[in-house]
């Protein structure tokens, strides 16, 4: 007697067939950048890097010097939402402390 198959059957000739899963692309990442200015004290920049990017003193100092000598530097790479939050936090903190330090983001 022939075997009846239902339209919902996932078997074809005795072999299990998994339904196709759509490929999900990884989320885009963004670099959070600090821009150099002539007014923000270096120790404030180090504090920002430690506080908002969890860098130790040596790493924060290294990034601060990079920003100071090259005009800008990467603080970290994050998903869009995290990058947006960090940019907003740093810019607000800088303004609250009356410093012109500017934080931006760009696609990595």
UniProtKB/Swiss-Prot annotation:
Extent of Basic and acidic residues compositional bias: 1-15
Matches recorded under InterPro entries: ClpS, ClpS_core, Ribosomal_bL12_C/ClpS-like
Signal sequence interval, chain numbering: none
Record Gene3D superfamilies: 3.30.1390.10
Residue ranges, annotated region (Disordered): 1-24
GO biological process entries: protein catabolic process; proteolysis
Sequence similarity: Belongs to the ClpS family.
PANTHER family to which the protein is assigned, alphabetical: ATP-DEPENDENT CLP PROTEASE ADAPTER PROTEIN CLPS, ATP-DEPENDENT CLP PROTEASE ADAPTER PROTEIN CLPS1, CHLOROPLASTIC
Role played: Involved in the modulation of the specificity of the ClpAP-mediated ATP-dependent protein degradation.
Assembly and binders: Binds to the N-terminal domain of the chaperone ClpA.
The protein, known as: ATP-dependent Clp protease adapter protein ClpS
Source organism per UniProt: Stenotrophomonas maltophilia (strain R551-3)
Gene, per the UniProt record: clpS
């Amino acid at each position: 007697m022939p075997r009846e198959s239902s339209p919902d059957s996932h078997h074809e000739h005795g072999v299990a067939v998994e339904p196709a899963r759509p490929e999900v692309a990884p989320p885009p990442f963004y670099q959070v950048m600090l821009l150099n200015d002539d007014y923000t004290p270096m120790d404030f920049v180090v504090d920002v890097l430690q506080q908002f990017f969890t860098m130790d003193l040596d790493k924060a100092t290294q990034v601060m010097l990079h920003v100071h000598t090259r005009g800008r530097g990467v603080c970290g790479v994050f998903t869009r939402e995290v990058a947006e939050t960090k940019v907003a936090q740093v810019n607000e903190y800088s303004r609250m402390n009356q410093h012109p330090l500017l934080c931006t983001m760009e696609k990595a």
